[in-house]
Amino acid sequence: MSPQTETKASVGFKAGVKEYKLTYYTPEYETKDTDILAAFRVTPQPGVPPEEAGAAVAAESSTGTWTTVWTDGLTSLDRYKGRCYHIEPVPGEETQFIAYVAYPLDLFEEGSVTNMFTSIVGNVFGFKALAALRLEDLRIPPAYTKTFQGPPHGIQVERDKLNKYGRPLLGCTIKPKLGLSAKNYGRAVYECLRGGLDFTKDDENVNSQPFMRWRDRFLFCAEAIYKSQAETGEIKGHYLNATAGTCEEMIKRAVFARELGVPIVMHDYLTGGFTANTSLSHYCRDNGLLLHIHRAMHAVIDRQKNHGMHFRVLAKALRLSGGDHVHAGTVVGKLEGDRESTLGFVDLLRDDYIEKDRSRGIFFTQDWVSLPGVLPVASGGIHVWHMPALTEIFGDDSVLQFGGGTLGHPWGNAPGAVANRVALEACVQARNEGRDLAVEGNEIIREACKWSPELAAACEVWKEIRFNFPTVDTLDDQA
């Protein structure tokens, strides 16, 4: 480090560069109940001690900068600085460490996920002293949680609105995701809902393109919802994607959905941004709309094990910002998702109090102090043969969201929906009778095929489909 140069001697100020660990590495610190706690996976550059790397993360994500500044004397750094209070090695990784950082609550604006992330992950990830950096988990204290509204409605209120209990909800993403006219799109929605699904869904990149403007889509989908409700006697919904280029346009689309009387709208919360998402969530609560959240772009942030941000952090942020559903992987489908890790952040979405459990990737005990829960959505490459595993893994409080697994049925969309509904009802009944879905799942589906030709045809089509690829983002071995 450069030698310090003494200036402004009369006020005790020493200019120059000093090691971060002298100020920001404080292993003696006892965390407070009001601190936001972060667990970072740190990969220092060669020659950088882990204590210096952890302290650098704490400094650059709170009050520090690369050199001493005389305005440090105008505030109380001990009150406002982040502190690296513990460092532990990652089992099996010689160059990686978990650095635990505590942030005073006063560093963050109330009710703002945007400000929280701007502080904690906004700048430090490009720091040259680090080869890589990943935010593995956050502990959000009750004092901060209470400044957020959270999900517009939550799990129980949604079930009451829909009058659906005792089973997972069923959905389908309309395919092809792009290119259909609004009228043909509405037809597909109607066929799926009439066949037995609870929801259909806009794909994440369906906004308002030349082939299908948003207002036309909303109108034809509303017609499909009302027609299918009249024919089935069940409440139906379609996730109308309100995501737009501006917040004002997004709210305009949500207002139109409310005027049509539909039950739910949708938002792409990462590409749309947390400020937009929180605004839409507040509107949905005030106006009785459910809010479905898609996580488009998440894998850019969370897939690599040594750099970025784990999805459990994005899931916690979504629960604060607000959403009634969020896509959470499938474990068994075509998209990335380790089973234990997925179960960990599914609990973080749904439950009120979650104990620390490193075997599931949960670094901190999290108390949501009665903030409403979020329904996890299993979506991506799933079909009827996956139904027993999905029911066993996710339980009743979930949405099982098919796409090609409904619309790819050889007899059409409505028979595809029938096959999904029959498979789900068979699995729920078998589970309620005490059968083990993990062991007897295939047999349960085969038995149901005997009285559902639609399910039998679906099983024949997808009997050979597998997505057997190793998971990239796996949990660490626990020593």
Swiss-Prot record:
It is found in: Plastid, Chloroplast. The record marks 334 as: Transition state stabilizer. InterPro entries: RuBisCO, RuBisCo_large_chain_AS, RuBisCO_lsu_C, RuBisCO_lsu_C_sf, RuBisCO_lsu_fd_N, RuBisCO_lsu_N_sf, RuBisCO_lsuI. Keywords: Calvin cycle, Carbon dioxide fixation, Chloroplast, Disulfide bond, Lyase, Magnesium, Metal-binding, Monooxygenase, Oxidoreductase, Phosphoprotein, Photorespiration, Photosynthesis, Plastid. The modification N6-carboxylysine is found at residue 201. RuBisCO catalyzes two reactions: the carboxylation of D-ribulose 1,5-bisphosphate, the primary event in carbon dioxide fixation, as well as the oxidative fragmentation of the pentose substrate in the photorespiration process. Both reactions occur simultaneously and in competition at the same active site. NCBIfam families: PRK04208.1. Belongs to the RuBisCO large chain family. Type I subfamily. This is Ribulose bisphosphate carboxylase large chain. It comes from Olimarabidopsis pumila. The lineage of its organism: Eukaryota, Viridiplantae, Streptophyta, Embryophyta, Tracheophyta.
